[in-house]
């Protein structure tokens, strides 16, 4: 009987054309990752082999990997067959015959390769080439595993394994954070996050990585190699996955869909980030104040508030910003650039998000609903701010006077009181404002523009907040209720004024006679006495 050391063919996976087309995009991506990982594990065992065709094509081709699809029968290379036939099986060793699907074989080899020297010196795999098998044998391959030390070998069922992948079932759980994974190899990679292990080190700069694929990608930064070019626009990429993701910009393909709301994404990472909105998961925590964030970039931006680090400075006016996107948005003020135009009314905006927010005015869509009072909002941020009315949460604190605010914009507006800064000046009348939004609102006085119209009575308004307040007259809605006496109000400012009756607070003081008032209008009326009006 002939035998030889295990070859990459033994641990490779191949599909028929029909089978390949049955796989969805996520499974095809998984296939690519598994084949690369298998190849990496295989060559780490020591055998010196040339790169198999399937890996070369995965590395170089621009289209989907049809090259790994078998059509009809399986073909073996003659040089591999001769290797199998020239060696003789040692009769002293025990032989375990295992009939298994190729995916099963791959899982076992990966599993045992992680357990030290068993794979290197103590056992050999034998793949018997029997020619063409019967059609009904399908994926089965016969492998003879020779070992003195290995006495047991747990057999997996391929159908179960395939169903786990196909159904998205996550059976491998991390004991540290309880996160679950479809494949054991992915769990092994994840565990390195907790252990801090980074076994793959760049010889050029010394930077270390948890995964070999990350090292390979990083190494191309040193070489400047970008072998994957988009045929549509000519943009080049270091890895095939980046090209695949980029091409979806041209095709409009969004294969990753959220099961909660149906929103689709080009990249799986985008879907993962989006799903945290539904789950409420915020895995990134600030070590200074304990605040948590859904995205790592949000944490990085927040941490600069503690360090007062402003790396991005405007060359026009010298104003500095915590992050690059804020600087780019600011620079459009100097350039007068407003590239995002509403097709309904022609109004233009500096950033795309502003246009998206504006368009919901025309559609009337309010998808975000408060579970406490049922009020709906156009923007999620509006819902979050509104919910703080119910929770009375004020997470933003002024470091100068320790006053707290329910929104970050209120804090920024307040802080300019301490520094006296009013950088936004009206070119018509010279009046200056602390916030750009205040200047924008003010300018509508000069232009006479009233873009916000009530659909009930057609009355127009300069500001959206004015329209919102007005609409509550038609609906009779009074969502702001005093918890002391139960009285309800249309506007939050009305509730705030009313609550001063219960608290006795009188924040508005006359500088002439030191008399205090609950409302600013009462102070204004009182000052007329001193002015002789």
From Swiss-Prot:
Q: Which residues form the KRAB domain?
A: 6-78
Q: Which UniProt keywords apply?
A: DNA-binding, Metal-binding, Nucleus, Repeat, Transcription, Transcription regulation, Zinc, Zinc-finger
**Where is this protein chiefly located?**
nucleus
Q: Does the keyword Ribosomal protein apply?
A: no
- Report the InterPro entries cross-referenced here: KRAB, KRAB_dom_sf, Znf_C2H2-type, Znf_C2H2_sf, Znf_C2H2_type
Return the GO cellular component terms, semicolon-separated. Answer: nucleus
Q: Which CDD domains match?
A: KRAB_A-box
Zinc finger spans (C2H2-type) are 172-194, 200-222, 228-250, 256-278, 284-306, 312-334, 340-362, 368-390, 396-418, 424-446, 452-474, 480-502, 508-530
Q: Does the keyword Metal-binding apply?
A: yes
Q: Name one GO molecular function term.
A: RNA polymerase II cis-regulatory region sequence-specific DNA binding
Record-stated family? Belongs to the krueppel C2H2-type zinc-finger protein family.
- Protein task: May be involved in transcriptional regulation.
Q: What is this protein called?
A: Zinc finger protein 14 homolog
The record lists the organism as Homo sapiens
